[in-house]
Swiss-Prot record:
GO molecular function annotation: (R,R)-butanediol dehydrogenase activity; zinc ion binding
Keywords: Cytoplasm, Metal-binding, NAD, Oxidoreductase, Secreted, Zinc
Main location: cytoplasm
Family stated for the protein in its record: Belongs to the zinc-containing alcohol dehydrogenase family.
Compartments it resides in: Cytoplasm; Secreted
Enzyme Commission code: 1.1.1.4
Name of the protein described by the UniProt record: (R,R)-butanediol dehydrogenase
Origin: domain of life: Bacteria
Protein species of origin: Bacillus subtilis (strain 168)
Description of how the protein assembles with itself and partners: Homotetramer. Interacts with BrxC.
Record's catalysed reaction(s): (R,R)-butane-2,3-diol + NAD(+) = (R)-acetoin + NADH + H(+)
GO annotation, cellular component aspect: cytoplasm; extracellular region
InterPro entries given in the database record: ADH-like_C, ADH-like_N, ADH_Zn_CS, GroES-like_sf, NAD(P)-bd_dom_sf, PKS_ER
Amino acid sequence: MKAARWHNQKDIRIEHIEEPKTEPGKVKIKVKWCGICGSDLHEYLGGPIFIPVDKPHPLTNETAPVTMGHEFSGEVVEVGEGVENYKVGDRVVVEPIFATHGHQGAYNLDEQMGFLGLAGGGGGFSEYVSVDEELLFKLPDELSYEQGALVEPSAVALYAVRSSKLKAGDKAAVFGCGPIGLLVIEALKAAGATDIYAVELSPERQQKAEELGAIIVDPSKTDDVVAEIAERTGGGVDVAFEVTGVPVVLRQAIQSTTIAGETVIVSIWEKGAEIHPNDIVIKERTVKGIIGYRDIFPAVLSLMKEGYFSADKLVTKKIVLDDLIEEGFGALIKEKSQVKILVRPN
């Protein structure tokens, strides 16, 4: 089968590899659609970050090259011995986190936690993948396979919002309106936030954020983003979400919050960032980070059935696996109009 495999920074190759075997407790899936995640782009441009290179990942026992892709949906084509809840023909989505004790407790914080499609175990940028039964969720009939490929990134956004102190009626700011930032806006709407400010330079992404109901703050049209948010809100937002991975933006996000406000860092960072402790201390603000998600896929699927996280609003391009590098990663690097690109194996 075909698979996109990470070999090194800026070296992802479409290769022919063996189809995965269906071992006991596992389910073999024919991949329908897989989204390109910001983490995939980080690995391509600046990796390895999560991909094991020098020593095997403790749970997959794999090192690079590894098959990439973790935002995917597909159809069950084979079930292993002992699988009870899935049958051939089922439409499914995959929660791609594996941990030492499976999906128990705070499994996203497990020291050995890994992502299928980054730490090994196969990936969605391939024709087939075989995964543990516990990683699967059935895709409701009313949701398309394209919509299914948005469940994983939507889980990141919903988990970020639900992990914050935000209450219905609160004001929020989202710094960065790439795919996750836009999904955070959707999650904030679902949580009952009133005014949602979107801080974004790209006119195309501003338009997407505005279509989702956000109030735009354009850094190119103001001398001071923080002052503008403070003026519009009467002192700052209750919660800010940093979704850029840009050092100067992190400080802006912290400063944009009100007294006792909170900043949630959603980004994965390639390098460090400098902040001034007094930005936190003097107004008794808090800053927290989130990694991935846990126990949230059912909530995402329920919200999708209500119309949130719509693929029609967020998917800007569909490509085939052979075009992943040029039309996928290349487009995301060069074209700021791109939001979510979906890939099908053939």
